[in-house]
């Protein structure tokens, strides 16, 4: 049994080591992209990319795990041939994926996914038309060499007959089989990515505001596998009219000057920014977005909703500007966030946040404000890796993300992580610290986003004002927002602060209302 357990562990660790070594190889191959990368950057790429490596190694070790179980009952030559064939196939597969990824990244700007396969199978001739014959031959040679090297490593460490012959048929076969089955089952933990609400996804490795470092941390084989699992034909879902008809209708909605390609501005408001009305007393205010989980107009008396629920927001609506024609963009947080922060409409059957290759290209308010000199930070008490949220936030321009891992374990008591009052308190303490560290003249304006999570199933909150658990959870989040504004108003920087509260989605107590009522 000892030899089988050691062989199982060696197999898993060997896969992990191969994937880890691919990261510095990628960075060396594209050394022109990383001329100023420090040693810390190199180690950060390896460290943050490790979750995907551990997950993929788990997938690839599952079959050897069952082969080890089979070896408890038979040590036939057929089993040895199956063993060798599996690792030969894996060697070729890893070699093809890694080599193709190296070759295409220069042109595509993202790590390998299903896109090249789509183009190749749609039209193989056109797919390779822009590639010289020497590049194709060079790629094939590189694949072959890498596959041979990988198989030699597998053979030398795992497949030598003398190593396999050391294994004997055990006396307690059921016991040994049970232990090996348990070990194989434990691979589910790295495959899934732990026990949090989020499962393993490419976005989990995003850690830097520099996309080149995030891309280097991605495991291309995992990226390809995830992309194939999510492959959809979007053209069949959303192609409602011919392109010419769509262009004609869109052109009619544009201003004449824009539609005609003119550059001079004819409107008096367009000519001078000074003519625009403003509600601010400073040109570069600090900006805070508070994104309220599942809130709707039905919770606010000011918007015609039920009384005595969101009493603090009702009060604030009389002091600030109330938008009465603001509508929820979707019914899921991952879709609503992209609509709020990037102005990207939600799709009915999918979420763009789950496609890091797409989200890295869409504009976002965080990126625009960062270019304007703002410091950007995102606060969320839950798991920032849920539905690829981390990759979207880092790509969109947020320099730092505060999530559940930044709170003590004793404060992560809800299903979704830290309760809302703890997240608001963390934000308030950070703002006080930043205000104390610099003078008003040298202070960098900030853009902060706080996303709540307590007003979500199972609606368990450390607060009791209403009998209904669901409504009480909304009242709790409302009280957290009210306390934050009350305490924040005591700060000396409050006059330079612009706050905006809005919901991510609209969930209205299970009742269905016309879309026009889903504020």
What is the role of each PLM region?
Residues 119, 123-129, 184-269, 274:
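Membrane-interface segments at or immediately adjacent to transmembrane helices
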Residues 55-68, 140-156:
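Hydrophobic cores of alpha-helical transmembrane segments in multi-pass inner/ER membrane proteins
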Residues 2-14, 78-92, 173-176:
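Alpha-helical transmembrane segments and their helix-start/interface "positive-inside/aromatic belt" motifs
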Residues 22-52, 83-143, 160-167, 192-222:
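Membrane-interfacial interhelical loops
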Residues 17, 176-190:
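Hydrophobic membrane-insertion alpha-helices, especially the h-region
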Residues 255-519:
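Solvent-exposed soluble domains appended to multi-pass membrane proteins
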Residues 74, 145-179:
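Cytosolic-side transmembrane helix boundary signature
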């Amino acid at each position: 049994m000892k030899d089988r357990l050691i062989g199982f562990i060696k197999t898993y660790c060997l896969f992990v080591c191969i994937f880890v070594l691919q990261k510095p190889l990628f960075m060396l191959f594209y050394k022109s992209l990383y001329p100023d990368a420090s040693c810390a950057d190199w180690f950060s790429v390896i460290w943050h990319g490790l979750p995907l490596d551990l997950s993929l190694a788990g997938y690839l070790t599952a079959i050897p795990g069952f082969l080890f179980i089979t070896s408890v009952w038979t040590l036939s030559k057929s089993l040895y041939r199956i063993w060798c064939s599996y690792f030969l196939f894996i060697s070729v597969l890893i070699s093809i994926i890694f080599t193709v990824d190296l070759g295409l990244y220069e042109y595509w700007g993202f790590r390998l996914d299903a896109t090249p396969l789509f183009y190749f199978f749609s039209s193989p001739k056109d797919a390779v038309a822009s590639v010289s014959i020497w590049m194709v031959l060079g790629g094939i040679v590189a694949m072959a060499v890498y596959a041979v090297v990988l198989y030699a490593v597998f053979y030398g460490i795992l497949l030598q007959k003398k190593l396999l012959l050391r294994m004997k048929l055990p006396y307690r076969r059921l016991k040994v089989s049970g232990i090996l089955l348990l070990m194989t089952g434990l691979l589910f933990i790295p495959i899934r990515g732990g026990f949090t609400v989020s499962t393993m996804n490419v976005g989990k490795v995003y850690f830097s505001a520099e996309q080149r470092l995030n891309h280097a941390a991605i495991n291309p084989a995992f990226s390809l596998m995830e992309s194939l699992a999510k492959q959809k034909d979007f053209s069949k879902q959303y192609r409602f009219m011919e392109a010419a008809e769509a262009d004609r209708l869109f052109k009619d909605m544009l201003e004449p000057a824009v539609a005609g390609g003119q550059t001079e501005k004819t409107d008096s408001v367009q000519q001078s920014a000074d003519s625009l009305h403003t509600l601010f007393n400073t040109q570069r205010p600090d900006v805070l977005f508070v994104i309220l989980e599942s809130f709707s107009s039905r919770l606010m008396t000011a918007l015609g909703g039920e009384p005595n629920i969101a009493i603090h927001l009702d009060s604030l609506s009389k002091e600030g500007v109330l938008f009465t024609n603001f509508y929820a963009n979707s019914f899921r947080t991952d879709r609503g966030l992209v609509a709020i922060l990037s102005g990207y409409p939600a799709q009915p059957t999918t979420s763009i946040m789950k496609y890091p290759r797409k989200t890295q290209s869409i504009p976002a308010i965080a990126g625009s404000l960062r270019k304007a000199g703002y410091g950007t930070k995102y606060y969320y008490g839950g798991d920032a890796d849920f539905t690829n949220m981390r990759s979207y936030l880092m790509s969109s321009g947020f320099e730092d993300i505060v999530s559940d891992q930044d709170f003590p374990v004793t404060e992560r008591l809800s299903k979704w992580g830290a309760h809302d009052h703890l997240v608001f308190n963390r934000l308030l303490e950070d703002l006080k610290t930043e205000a104390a560290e610099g003078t008003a003249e040298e202070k960098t304006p900030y853009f902060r986003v706080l996303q709540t999570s307590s007003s979500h199933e199972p609606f368990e909150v450390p607060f009791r004002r209403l009998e209904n658990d669901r409504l009480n959870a909304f009242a709790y989040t409302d009280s957290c927002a009210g306390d934050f504004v009350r305490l924040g108003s005591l700060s000396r920087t409050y006059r330079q602060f612009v706050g905006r509260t809005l919901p991510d989605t609209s969930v209205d107590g299970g009742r269905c209302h016309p879309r026009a009522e889903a504020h």
